[in-house]
């Protein structure tokens, strides 16, 4: 049992409470060998540079414990009220060396997560357990852990993930030389493990309690020695560190006020001049020339790169001088750099609101030209003579208002205003800006040096002087003061800056655009003969000295060159021009006689400001083009004006205007210098980032030569207006223009970039290993150099757990790209259930098509790229919109991530279904196994299955060859039965056998009707011979001819008879078929009508598919088109705006573009999120339909098609699923009056009978009898007693209630109308969704319009066909065959005389014989009687009687 008591108080600042038992003893820290190096090495881990530093933290300066138990079981120690916990390996005096170590477990409790440090036991005894090699630190959400059963393998179950596990080495020989520990606060945890520190960004509520598990005594000889010593720390302590010439020294800092102030305000810059993490930025402010930021995160260019930090305890009375150029950094703390100093920051590092500066304080600013201006403040309104009195700038809290002036030679030049009530920082830039607490208090000419005299007063505070340079950084501001800085100096930090967060969560982020910097200028113009004009504008300034300020006289003069004896207007008449300004300055005292030079504070220069023109004066020579350009001193006819001002050391005054008359075009161009003559002034810098001006279109990009040939056009743009390419008219070569850097998505895991997805195959973000996917290139820290996986799709052999996912792919911690594991199923189960429908009497089967969207294509938008297109100045302006881009990008990313998770959990993959989905594999032998494996299959590897339907080759030839068809004429005639075949077989091909081989058909002699040439010659000769020899009794020669003729005539007559019979049979059969055809066409008409409806349904489904697929493309297309909108700016091109205007004027114009484009992005994101919400509901509907329609049979009428559901099939479709519902549609109904039950009485009681089966309906027929019928089909039958259930009574109870009370009566009651209304109210937007018209967009675009129109046309055509078929059926019914019968002549042929003679002879011969046989034979016949008599007389004595002999069988 563990007894928790209070055992120890450490009375420094707080206390530590712990368990008390005899197992734990205090250990003198000096008894730990090597301990003198532990603290030093520990403190100097993050202090790598030279200098002095005070660090504070929960360091191991308290009591060490050595805990062990003599029991066999483990024991626990509980630490409370601590902020850090440390432990060390066994290193006791007189230790036996390699002692048997015990397991260690440290559990730091918190919410929602806790920390567990676990080290397993190590031994090398007979049990052969290996020496301990590793320990583990992990983050867990488990509130409680079973310490007794906790093993080294169980950490996989309780740790959150690989990004929250830190394995570390623990070697027994490191006794006392390594310090292990944990220090935590609400924002992060620092783990000191194996000479390394790990910072884990964890936002957590820590209970400041630690549970320690320790084991029984080891084999070390020292009493109560154990494997580890422990220390819980509750006190915050400071150490003063010093590192000089490689020598390290440290000491405990005991002056609390000094140590606190030093640690808070002094730091040692790291390599590169960066301020280290953890610095408090006490009294550091963000410098601004306009309004001051109160709170938020901003990416800005600030003087935060420290070249030298000089901690100054105090100044003497003597003045100190600080110069920007040639500064000698001899007292720097930390590194010192030789960079150009932009701003010197004086940080007044006091911790209490006291007045620090007590002496005379005057800031002297040595400006350009040697003029020294002084800034001082006074506690009261003073006269001019009083400026020579003692002024001051009190540092800290002032005791009253202070009025500040700019002085020159003791005379006030300008009143600056009232000093802030508390001065904590003064920053002065070399460009003449003077900041107090970050606010631009005063601006003048550039400054060379600063001097002031100051004493620190009575507060004892000290200064830090920081020589800084401007750098881009993410600055977190709270209450106008800097709290945290993240430098945008690396790839990962650039992403942090673009996302406006110092801590990146795991995910995909758009890669920030890189700074282009100074690049070459490319210009493309049409070749022309150029004439040049130089326009010299002269400005004569007249300056006067007022009481407190220098003013420009309105008599200052502006002079234009003379043109046509006119000096008021000057127009450009050449096609090139350059504008130059020359200014002079004269001064006077109080009159208007300007005859003195402008010296000292009267020195002024003339500047021409933008005014109302859409371009700046100093950009006119930057290849701006016009059709007309004139300068005028009068406003008549002017399009805009330029302001002319005098700039002095203290202010800037507008004293006149220069008016401009212009027309936009390309005829006149402003150039930096004279290039007159016949020239092609085009200058191209190929294959490198360049600032271009191509035919008046400006921007930054890479120009490359292409092989394309385009006949028309000079330049080519996208829908958004961006330049895609141009053509050189001299040689016709077409060049492409691409951005200097392309947008990419970086995969960030655990604060580091592990991979990036990009559209081009080019190294980026320092990643060199790459692979390809169907949609993008992927660069990674994972080694994709193997030939097997480089340049291929995702490597399926990579086995790792993805940390982040994008669509169906994931990225592991090692940067490898893997497929998301999908859930597999073995097969589909499709149970069948009865539907709930009306009572139809007849059905028709219909297939109805339904499409349901399941997912949307994830969209990632690089907001900064969309808004600014990589323009660095625009990117800086964009940071003023705080987290606008971050919100847009995170909304899309989180929506895509959520949808991806839902889809992954929804979809299952069946391997069988996946195989059958392939047309090539559908009929393959493997998939048809075992039924068709032994048979050839159609559609598989061969077409053997067709052999049974091909004509077979017979061995006996029944046809002529092709050669015979060529050599002989083929005559086809109608024949009688087998007459022709018998004739051919008998004749054997001999023509002379014609008459001999005559055949007989129904007793009539016939010959085939066709005779060849030989037969005709033969019979002609017979006829001729008969005619010639007729007088000589030779007419018999013509007999063969006559017989043959008659035989062939008989053949024809018999043919006619057969034809007549066939004609009658055909007519009867055709008339009978007409009725069948009429019925068939009626059914075809119905089928086509149903097909027409089906095609219409398919067309609607395809239209929905097209709408779903193209909706996102339409939105993206509209989003792209918005880039052409200038949103009331002078141009939609940011580069063009900065090319025309000065920076301040251009910022105002670009701000309009940023606002408009962010609004368009917000509208797109809102529409996308709304669409995702709709798809989420649609996805659930699809899931329900798969379960109810595909995997079972729905009982709901209309849910799975409009009818009684039979079965459904589902198939994949773009972005969703398409269902084919087979349903029964009732075509006829039987209307019955249904009864809910029967109420009966027998006099003494009343009871009710209700139908037991709810699938049956009880109704009363017209014959007054009751019947039962199923509700799915009208099949009435007489009810039986087994169909009813008796109930107690017949009373029906109705409950009166409102709709509001229904849920309390029926818990699952849902008011559909009210629910829909509530949903509409909840999802009603408070913004206006813009109309997103359909436009062509360079993205995946599904154009099914033609197919849908074709389906609709076919459906309409089928409908028209049904109408035509109806008419045709009527015509067929009226068309019956009525054939005219051919006359059939029956001729009876008499038998010849010899036949009758033969018949008579047969009769004469046969009748006597028959009579004789009948009358004379037999036992009673005459012959029989006579024979008997003769036999008895003649044979009586010859034959004796004998006994019959029987058969004898011998065996």
Swiss-Prot record:
Record region (Heptad repeat 1 (HR1)): 1039-1158
Residue ranges of the TM segments: 1393-1412
Q: What is this protein called?
A: Spike glycoprotein
UniProt motif (KxHxx) ranges: 1447-1451
Coiled coil start-end: 1106-1150, 1340-1382
Q: Can you name a GO cellular component term?
A: membrane
Q: Which keywords label this protein? A: Coiled coil, Glycoprotein, Host membrane, Host-virus interaction, Membrane, Signal, Transmembrane, Transmembrane helix, Viral attachment to host cell, Viral envelope protein, Virion, Virulence, Virus entry into host cell
Task: Enumerate the residue ranges of region (Interaction with host ANPEP).
Answer: 660-803
- Subunit architecture: Homotrimer. During virus morphogenesis, found in a complex with M and HE proteins. Interacts with host ANPEP.
* A biological process term (GO) from this entry: receptor-mediated virion attachment to host cell
Q: Cross-referenced Pfam families, in alphabetical order?
A: CoV_S1, CoV_S1_C, CoV_S2, CoV_S2_C
Q: Which InterPro entries match?
A: ALPHA_CORONA_SPIKE (IPR042552), CoV_S1_C (IPR043607), S2_sf_CoV (IPR043473), Spike_S1_CoV (IPR002551), Spike_S2_CoV (IPR002552), Spike_S2_CoV_C (IPR043614), Spike_S2_CoV_HR1 (IPR044873), Spike_S2_CoV_HR2 (IPR044874)
- Specify where the region named S2 lies, as residue ranges: 780-1451
Q: What family is it from?
A: Belongs to the alphacoronaviruses spike protein family.
Q: What is its main location?
A: virion
Q: Which residues lie on this side of the membrane: Intravirion?
A: 1413-1451
Q: Which residue intervals make up region (Heptad repeat 2 (HR2))?
A: 1307-1404
Q: Where is this region: Fusion peptide?
A: 1024-1045
Q: Which intervals lie on the Virion surface side per UniProt? A: 32-1392
The written remark on domains in the entry is: The KxHxx motif seems to function as an ER retrieval signal.
Q: Give me the gene this protein comes from.
A: S
How does this protein sit in the membrane?
Answer: Single-pass type I membrane protein
Q: Where is the signal peptide?
A: 1-31
Give the protein's biological function.
S1 region attaches the virion to the cell membrane by interacting with host ANPEP/aminopeptidase N, initiating the infection. Binding to the receptor probably induces conformational changes in the S glycoprotein unmasking the fusion peptide of S2 region and activating membranes fusion. S2 region belongs to the class I viral fusion protein. Under the current model, the protein has at least 3 conformational states: pre-fusion native state, pre-hairpin intermediate state, and post-fusion hairpin state.
List the residue ranges of the region (S1): 32-779
Q: Where in the cell is it found?
A: Virion membrane; Host endoplasmic reticulum-Golgi intermediate compartment membrane
């Amino acid at each position: 049992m563990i007894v928790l008591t209070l055992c120890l108080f450490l009375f420094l600042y707080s206390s530590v409470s712990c368990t008390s038992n005899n197992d734990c003893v205090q250990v003198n820290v000096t008894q730990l060998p090597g301990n003198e190096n532990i603290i030093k090495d520990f403190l100097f881990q993050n202090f790598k540079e030279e200098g002095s530093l005070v660090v504070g933290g929960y360091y191991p300066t308290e009591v060490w414990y050595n805990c062990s138990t003599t029991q066999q079981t483990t024991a626990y120690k509980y630490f409370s009220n601590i902020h850090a916990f440390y432990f060390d390996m066994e290193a006791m005096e007189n230790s036996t060396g390699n002692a048997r170590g015990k397991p260690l477990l440290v559990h730091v409790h918190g919410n929602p997560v806790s920390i567990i440090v676990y080290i397993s036991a190590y031994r090398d005894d007979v049990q052969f357990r290996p020496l301990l090699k590793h320990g583990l630190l992990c983050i867990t959400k488990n509130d409680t852990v079973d310490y007794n059963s906790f093993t080294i393998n169980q950490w996989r179950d309780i740790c959150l993930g690989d990004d929250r596990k830190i394995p570390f080495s623990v070697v027994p020989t490191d006794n006392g030389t390594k310090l292990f520990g944990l220090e935590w606060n609400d924002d992060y945890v620092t783990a000191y493990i194996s000479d390394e520190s790990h910072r884990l960004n964890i936002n957590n509520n820590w209970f400041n309690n630690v549970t320690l598990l320790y084991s029984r005594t080891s084999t070390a000889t020292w009493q109560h020695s154990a494997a580890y010593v422990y220390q819980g720390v509750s006190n915050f302590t400071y150490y003063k560190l010093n590192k000089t010439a490689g020598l390290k020294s440290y000491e405990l800092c005991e002056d609390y006020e000094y140590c606190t102030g030093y640690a808070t305000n002094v730091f040692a810059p790291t390599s590169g001049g960066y301020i280290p993490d953890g610095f408090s930025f006490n009294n550091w402010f963000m410098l601004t020339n306009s309004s001051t930021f109160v709170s938020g995160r901003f990416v800005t260019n600030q003087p935060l790169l420290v070249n030298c930090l000089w901690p100054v305890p105090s100044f003497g009375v003597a003045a100190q001088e600080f110069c920007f150029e040639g500064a000698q950094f001899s007292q720097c703390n930390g590194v010192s750099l030789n960079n150009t100093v932009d701003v010197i920051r004086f940080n007044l590092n006091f911790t209490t609101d006291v007045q620090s500066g007590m002496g005379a304080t005057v800031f002297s600013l040595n400006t350009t030209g040697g003029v020294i201006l002084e800034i001082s403040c006074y506690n009261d309104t003073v006269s001019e003579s009083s400026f020579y009195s003692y002024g001051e700038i009190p540092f800290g809290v002032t005791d009253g208002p202070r009025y500040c002036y700019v002085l020159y030679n003791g005379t006030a030049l300008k009143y600056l205003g009232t000093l802030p009530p508390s001065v904590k920082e003064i920053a002065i830039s070399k460009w003449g800006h003077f900041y107090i607490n970050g606010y631009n208090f005063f601006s003048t000419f550039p400054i060379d040096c600063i001097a002031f005299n100051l004493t620190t007063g009575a507060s004892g505070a000290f200064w830090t002087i920081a020589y800084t340079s401007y750098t881009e950084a993410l600055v977190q501001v709270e209450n106008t003061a800097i709290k945290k800085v993240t430098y945008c100096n690396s790839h990962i930090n650039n992403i942090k800056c673009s996302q406006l967060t110092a801590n990146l969560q795991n995910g995909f982020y758009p890669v920030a655009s890189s700074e282009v910097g100074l690049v070459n200028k490319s210009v493309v113009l049409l070749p022309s003969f150029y004439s040049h004009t130089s326009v010299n504008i002269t400005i004569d300034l007249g300056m006067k000295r007022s009481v407190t300020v220098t003013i420009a006289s309105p008599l200052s003069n502006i002079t234009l060159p003379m043109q046509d004896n006119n000096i008021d207007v000057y127009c450009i008449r050449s096609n090139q021009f350059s504008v130059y300004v020359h200014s002079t300055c004269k001064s006077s005292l109080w009159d208007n006689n300007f005859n003195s030079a402008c010296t000292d504070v009267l020195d002024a220069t003339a500047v021409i400001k933008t005014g109302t023109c859409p371009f700046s004066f100093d950009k006119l020579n930057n290849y701006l083009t016009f059709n007309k350009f004139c300068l005028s001193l009068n406003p008549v006819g002017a399009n805009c004006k330029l302001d002319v001002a005098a700039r002095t050391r203290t202010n800037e005054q507008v004293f006149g205007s220069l008016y401009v008359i212009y027309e936009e075009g390309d005829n006149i161009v402003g150039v930096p210098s004279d290039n007159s003559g016949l020239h092609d002034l085009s200058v191209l810098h190929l294959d490198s980032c360049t600032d271009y001006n191509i035919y008046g279109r400006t921007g930054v990009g890479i120009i490359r030569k292409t092989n394309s040939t385009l006949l028309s056009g000079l330049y080519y743009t996208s829908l958004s207006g961006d330049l895609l390419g141009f053509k050189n008219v001299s040689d016709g070569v077409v060049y492409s223009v691409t951005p200097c850097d392309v947008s990419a998505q970086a995969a960030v895991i655990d604060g580091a970039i592990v991979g990036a997805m990009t559209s081009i195959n080019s190294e980026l973000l320092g990643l060199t290993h790459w692979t390809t996917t169907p949609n993008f290139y992927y660069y990674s820290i994972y080694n994709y150099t193997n030939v097997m996986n480089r340049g291929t799709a995702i490597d399926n052999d990579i086995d790792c757990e993805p940390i982040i996912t994008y669509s169906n792919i994931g990225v592991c911690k090692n940067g490898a790209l893997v497929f998301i594991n999908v859930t597999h199923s073995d097969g589909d189960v499709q149970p069948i259930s009865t539907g709930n429908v009306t009572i139809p009497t007849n059905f028709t089967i219909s297939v109805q098509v339904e499409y349901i969207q399941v997912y949307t294509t994830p969209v990632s938008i690089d907001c900064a790229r969309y808004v600014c297109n990589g323009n660095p100045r625009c990117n800086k302006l964009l940071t003023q919109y705080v987290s606008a881009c971050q919100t847009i990008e995170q909304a899309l990313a989180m929506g895509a991530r959520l949808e991806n998770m839902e889809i992954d959990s929804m979809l299952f993959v069946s391997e069988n279904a996946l195989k059958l989905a392939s047309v090539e594999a559908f009929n393959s032998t493997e998939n048809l196994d075992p039924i068709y494996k032994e048979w050839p299959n159609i559609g598989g590897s061969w077409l053997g299955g067709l052999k049974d339907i091909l004509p077979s080759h017979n061995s006996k030839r029944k046809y002529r060859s092709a050669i015979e068809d060529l050599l002989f004429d083929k005559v086809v005639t109608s024949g009688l039965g087998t007459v022709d075949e018998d004739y051919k077989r008998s004749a054997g091909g001999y023509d002379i056998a014609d008459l001999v081989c005559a055949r007989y058909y129904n007793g009539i002699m016939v010959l085939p009707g066709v005779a060849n040439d030989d037969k005709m010659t033969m019979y002609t000769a017979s006829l001729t011979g008969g005619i010639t020899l007729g007088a000589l009794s030779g007419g018999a020669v013509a007999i063969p001819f006559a017989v043959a003729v008659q035989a062939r005539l008989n053949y024809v007559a018999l043919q006619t008879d057969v034809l007549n019979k066939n004609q009658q049979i055909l007519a009867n059969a055709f008339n009978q078929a007409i009725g069948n055809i009429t019925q068939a066409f009626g059914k075809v008409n119905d089928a086509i009508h149903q097909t027409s409806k089906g095609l219409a349904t398919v067309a609607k489904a395809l239209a929905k598919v097209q709408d779903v697929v193209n909706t996102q493309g339409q939105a993206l297309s509209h989003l792209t088109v918005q880039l052409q909108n200038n949103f009331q700016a002078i141009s939609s091109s940011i580069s063009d705006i900065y090319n025309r205007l000065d920076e301040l004027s251009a910022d105002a114009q670009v701000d309009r573009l940023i606002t408009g484009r962010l609004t368009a992005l917000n509208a797109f994101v809102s529409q996308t999120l709304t669409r995702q919400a709709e798809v989420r509901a649609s996805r659930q509907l699809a899931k329900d339909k798969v379960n109810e329609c595909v995997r079972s049979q729905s009982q709901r009428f209309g849910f799975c098609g409009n009818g009684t559901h039979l079965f459904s099939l589902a198939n994949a479709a773009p972005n969703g699923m398409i269902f084919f519902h087979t349903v029964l549609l009732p075509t006829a109904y039987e209307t019955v009056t249904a009864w809910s039950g029967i109420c009966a009485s027998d006099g003494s009681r009343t009871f009710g009978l209700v139908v037991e089966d709810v699938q049956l309906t009880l109704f009363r027929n017209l014959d007054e009898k009751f019947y039962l019928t199923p509700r799915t089909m009208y099949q009435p039958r007489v009810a039986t007693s087994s169909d009813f259930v008796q109930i107690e009574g017949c009373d029906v109870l109705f409950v009166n209630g409102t709709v509001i009370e229904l849920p309390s009566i029926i818990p699952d009651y849902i008011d559909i109308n009210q629910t829909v209304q509530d949903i509409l109210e909840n999802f009603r937007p408070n913004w206006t969704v813009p109309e997103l018209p359909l436009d062509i967009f360079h993205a995946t675009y599904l154009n099914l319009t033609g197919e849908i129109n074709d389906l609709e046309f076919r459906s309409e055509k089928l409908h028209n066909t049904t109408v035509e078929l109806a008419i045709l059926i009527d015509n067929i019914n009226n068309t019956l065959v009525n054939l005219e019968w051919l006359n059939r002549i029956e001729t009876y042929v008499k038998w010849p005389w010899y036949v009758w003679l033969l018949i008579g002879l047969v009769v004469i011969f046969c009748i006597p014989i028959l009579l004789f046989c009948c009358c004379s034979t037999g036992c009673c016949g005459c012959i029989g009687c006579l024979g008997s008599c003769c036999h008895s007389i003649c044979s009586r004595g010859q034959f004796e009687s004998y006994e019959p002999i029987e058969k004898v069988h011998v065996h």
